[in-house]
């Protein structure tokens, strides 16, 4: 007889199986462990282990329409498709980036709200979110049983950002052209850039997507950063005429291989242009592009997830957290705080600056040493004043790439610890 615990496991296995395409590595590992359990318990359960699943929602969206077409009579819901990084939240209870399959940490209140929405309707396959300028918007909800409008209303009650949408009855064959597209785009009446419009006909599950645009080339004058939150900065690409080209995040900047004082390909919409990442933008390797972008942005910033952050105060916070002492705003405060604890002072004295700085940032030791062995440093008064990576091939390792993107932060902490150690023991 099947036990209550077995039923719980089987239900979880079925739920994970249905959402495999939207799963991250953690969810896949859980799924595989349940498959192994099910096979050993029941011999045959009808599903198999998986090694890698590409996150995809293509079954729910038809081919994108790039040219004018006739739309049939009927009742429709029109939704904006926003510019930004697309994520899927599904029964696996993880926010997973479309395409890469990488999971993304979200605030507890957003996770709780998403779970409440999913639990309200067991026919929901997934919630679609977009992340732009560190702001989450739920832009679609796929359910077998109800319209996304109903789910939007519930999501809004739970505190999630939802899109403006249009409910329209079309009474006769209508040409959907640039003019109608522009009217609808304006009717959504919000400030977020929209890359396309999707629509659903009443009674149908599959979305249609309309994306009218033109390709163009623009001359890049500079690459800068814009502040979008508390020590969060997004890349900004400026043309010779002073216009901004929209960039999703740091990875988008890298993939496009954009370089100052060159032309780049863009998708031109009605009111803005989007940086287009394609192979024609150059022959540089990803590692070479990362090095150049970081050199361009400057030593005051480091890669922090999808965005940039400024070195300095964040480094002091990580150092005080590692030492388990009160937060300090300056090096003077840090020295005073360390002097209050003999244990902390001995730790500073006995551990190398190199190791303590690395541990503060949680870098894997082997990957960190591999990176350092491919770099050259300029040292003055025991502090790093400059560094250069001599072989970018090591950046093919994603972990090493992440460490290098964050290396300005390491240098800041290293120099701070060096300064603190001198004041304490010399």
From Swiss-Prot:
Which UniProt keywords are listed?
DNA replication, Phosphoprotein
Pfam families given in the database record: Chordopox_A20R (PF05941)
The alphabetized list of GO BP terms reads: DNA replication
Q: Domain of life here?
A: Viruses
Q: Where are the transmembrane segments?
A: none
Q: Where is the signal peptide?
A: none
Q: Which family does it belong to?
A: Belongs to the orthopoxvirus OPG148 family.
Q: Quaternary state and partners of this protein?
A: Interacts with the DNA polymerase catalytic subunit OPG071. Interacts with UDG/OPG116. Component of the uracil-DNA glycosylase(UDG)-OPG148-polymerase complex; OPG148 and UDG form a heterodimeric processivity factor that associates with OPG071 to form the processive polymerase holoenzyme. Interacts with OPG117.
* Physiological role: Plays an essential role in viral DNA replication by acting as the polymerase processivity factor together with protein OPG116. Serves as a bridge which links the DNA polymerase OPG071 and the uracil DNA glycosylase.
Protein name listed in UniProt: DNA polymerase processivity factor component OPG148
